[in-house]
Amino acid sequence: DRDSCVDKSRCAKYGYYQECTDCCKKYGHNGGTCMFFKCKCA
């Protein structure tokens, strides 16, 4: 689902989004961003 990467990918404190983005892309999303240290797929 849309938040399938929240628990699978960490969001670092200073904007290291790559892990989140890669996870989201793997699940067919366009990418991801970090909000409040949680990964959100877009």
UniProtKB/Swiss-Prot annotation:
Keywords: Disulfide bond, Ion channel impairing toxin, Knottin, Neurotoxin, Potassium channel impairing toxin, Secreted, Toxin, Voltage-gated potassium channel impairing toxin. SUPFAM superfamilies: Scorpion toxin-like. GO terms for molecular function: potassium channel inhibitor activity; toxin activity. Pfam families: Toxin_17. Expressed by the venom gland. InterPro entries: Ergtoxin, Scorpion_toxin-like_sf. It is found in: Secreted. Disulfide bonds join 5-23, 11-34, 20-39, 24-41. GO terms for cellular component: extracellular region. Belongs to the ergtoxin family. Gamma-KTx 1 subfamily. The presence of a 'disulfide through disulfide knot' structurally defines this protein as a knottin. Has the CSalpha/beta fold, which comprises one or two short alpha helices connected to anti-parallel beta-sheets stabilized by three or four disulfide bonds. Blocks Kv11/ERG potassium channels. This is Potassium channel toxin gamma-KTx 1.2. It comes from Centruroides elegans (Bark scorpion). The lineage of its organism: Eukaryota, Metazoa, Ecdysozoa, Arthropoda, Chelicerata.
